[in-house]
Amino acid sequence: MSKIIAYDEEARRGLERGLNALADAVKVTLGPKGRNVVLEKKWGAPTITNDGVSIAKEIELEDPYEKIGAELVKEVAKKTDDVAGDGTTTATVLAQALVREGLRNVAAGANPLGLKRGIEKAVEKVTETLLKSAKEVETKEQIAATAAISAGDTQIGELIAEAMDKVGNEGVITVEESNTFGLQLELTEGMRFDKGYISGYFVTDAERQEAVLEDPYILLVSSKVSTVKDLLPLLEKVIQAGKPLLIIAEDVEGEALSTLVVNKIRGTFKSVAVKAPGFGDRRKAMLQDIAILTGGQVVSEEVGLSLETADVALLGTARKVVVTKDETTIVEGAGDSDAIAGRVAQIRAEIENSDSDYDREKLQERLAKLAGGVAVIKAGAATEVELKERKHRIEDAVRNAKAAVEEGIVAGGGVALLQSAPSLDELNLTGDEATGANIVRVALSAPLKQIAFNGGLEPGVVAEKVTNLPAGHGLNAATGEYEDLLKAGVADPVKVTRSALQNAASIAALFLTTEAVVADKPEKAAAPAGDPTGGMGGMDF
């Protein structure tokens, strides 16, 4: 395919147009008075959302240079969402402000590499200031307030705080759709481990990139599964039972994996293959934990069991299994409660007898997985569109609350970023590096200004006023009052604020140092073929 190339200012401006198109659509959602965006879907009802990363994913631009610019900003939103579960809109607004100021200086003759170094040093300083000023989240009320801001709903915030209180800060919280209205919290036996599906072809929900199995059989194998003839007798029995199958093994490869994938694609048989968690003896122990939790047995040569002779009686079961690319969650395993309690007691005894800090830490992890359980938040709504949007908000709020517990919280509403700007005075920079730091200083006010604008206030006036307020005091956009934001419950996890700034600066530096863009040449649509038979004389076709 032939390519087109743009250089210098033309290249950078093309990328900036794409960034602006995406950022302008996303930034209207920022803050408590932010608006919604409607996303058209090829199939089904449109989605209404105020989640930055969901909006960014949907934007596809026609111009090849603009398309690349938009894709780079999508990466900012996605990366921030992956790390912290929130802050995608803030990251996009910061990226837009950094690029706008940066390109203005590049056009005026500044050295892009000098600006890049200045931006990096300034971001490092602001990050350090944010982490120093962060307050630890200790109470249930603080967790509820942080989650409520992310979800835009106090009821959701309180429910998440309750869930974290019950399963612990590292515990598993999943969100499911409910047939009833409102929200419910259920605690179930369950486990999550950090291994995902071996092949993307196992995905059952393409939009969320998840494989969901309802009431599956669970096969646990301590060795590799590579030949299909070993697996076939058992597969036939599972297919006859009409249930899906989760395979957890050291690895699933070769023709065994191909057979599972082909049958999944054809719709003959639903299965998911996952690598077993851990290594060596720890892997064996974790497989045994899963076996006890699900009421199954580990197929292993050590205990005289092989795949060829394995029967359905050796398989575990669970109410539901959800597998993503990175992790597997087993909900309500069918294991015997006495056996689970016995296993928990055994692990506790091992923890007490262990001399190694590392071993003790790993045993604690196993104990938390086995005894902690899974909190399931069931969300209901009047329509499918509302239900999807609500479920997404709750999932983001859960990640947000966990981020708050991890690194602490700072004043929300863009105030922490703006009030960390004076720390840049401590940097002794000169020339283009000083200009780069100044670009960051200007950009730090962008989120607050956008929140004020979305709330119908004058951005410049609000930013000026907040600059002169004591640390942590600022605009509560929900009420229009200037107050101590942490006391008022307007807080952001510092992990969210920090990630948003770091990711935005990373992409802005790439924009400024770009000297050429190579893009695919847009193909002209082929002219429709004429009628080979020709028309009838005198007739108008």
Swiss-Prot record:
GO terms for molecular function: ATP binding; ATP-dependent protein folding chaperone; isomerase activity; unfolded protein binding. It is an enzyme of class 5 (isomerase). GO terms for cellular component: capsule; cell surface; cytoplasm; extracellular region. Its EC number is 5.6.1.7. ATP binds at residues 29-32, 86-90, 413, 476-478, 492. It is found in: Secreted, Capsule; Cell surface; Secreted, Cell wall. Its main location: secreted. The keyword Chaperone applies. GO terms for biological process: protein refolding. NCBIfam families: GroEL, PRK00013.1, PRK12849.1, PRK12850.1, PRK12851.1. Belongs to the chaperonin (HSP60) family. This is Chaperonin GroEL 2. It comes from Mycolicibacterium vanbaalenii (strain DSM 7251 / JCM 13017 / BCRC 16820 / KCTC 9966 / NRRL B-24157 / PYR-1) (Mycobacterium vanbaalenii).
